[in-house]
């Protein structure tokens, strides 16, 4: 029996185009000014020091850091330092009302229904926990943060690595066979399945004929009793 659901964000709860067409450009436009003008802010200074360690350049100046961050964005690298800095920038954007977090139409109602059924809900995304909380806290369906028990990002490991799902299961405190992971990416689901989890692939756009995972086009098409068989 499924007792907890862990969901991805991009392509799963939210249109990937919101992330790539709204969030990423917004952060990119403000990265340089954030690094140059706010490097004395303790929160930002901590991120920049972590970035220096990531680059193995403890004395890297602002220009070097900015160049590295832009390169990471170009490569879509899952850099924890980049994700943390993006989260700080997006926080201001959400609070200023520059945008709202996008959710597919059925997502909020289905998440609420699962919670009412006694399921615990979690998020696992390559975006920072801060960015996850912001997207769901300032979503186009309102503040959904009360629905979630916890959030996980790449600090537990990469999403295509099996050990990441073992770490999450341990943090949640449930055996893998009671956990369901939702994602649009087959390779992430492969890793979760290898760790003993149940899986469901969200097919929001093009079909994935290679996948061996159960598939659904919408959250309200996910039949939880199937996973008890």
Swiss-Prot record:
Keywords from the named record: Amino-acid biosynthesis, Hydrolase, Magnesium, Metal-binding, Methionine biosynthesis
Pfam family, one: Hydrolase
InterPro entries the record matches: Enolase-ppase_E1, HAD-like_sf, HAD-SF_hydro_IA, HAD_sf
Subunit and interaction comment: Monomer.
Reaction(s) catalysed (UniProt annotation): 5-methylsulfanyl-2,3-dioxopentyl phosphate + H2O = 1,2-dihydroxy-5-(methylsulfanyl)pent-1-en-3-one + phosphate
NCBIfam families in alphabetical order: enolase-ppase
Gene coding for it: mtnC
EC number: 3.1.3.77
SUPFAM superfamilies: HAD-like (SSF56784)
Listed transmembrane segments: none
Coiled-coil blocks: none
CDD domains, per the entry: HAD_EP
Family of this protein: Belongs to the HAD-like hydrolase superfamily. MasA/MtnC family.
Pathway(s): Amino-acid biosynthesis; L-methionine biosynthesis via salvage pathway; L-methionine from S-methyl-5-thio-alpha-D-ribose 1-phosphate: step 3/6; Amino-acid biosynthesis; L-methionine biosynthesis via salvage pathway; L-methionine from S-methyl-5-thio-alpha-D-ribose 1-phosphate: step 4/6
Protein name, UniProt field: Enolase-phosphatase E1
Note describing how the cofactor binds: Binds 1 Mg(2+) ion per subunit.
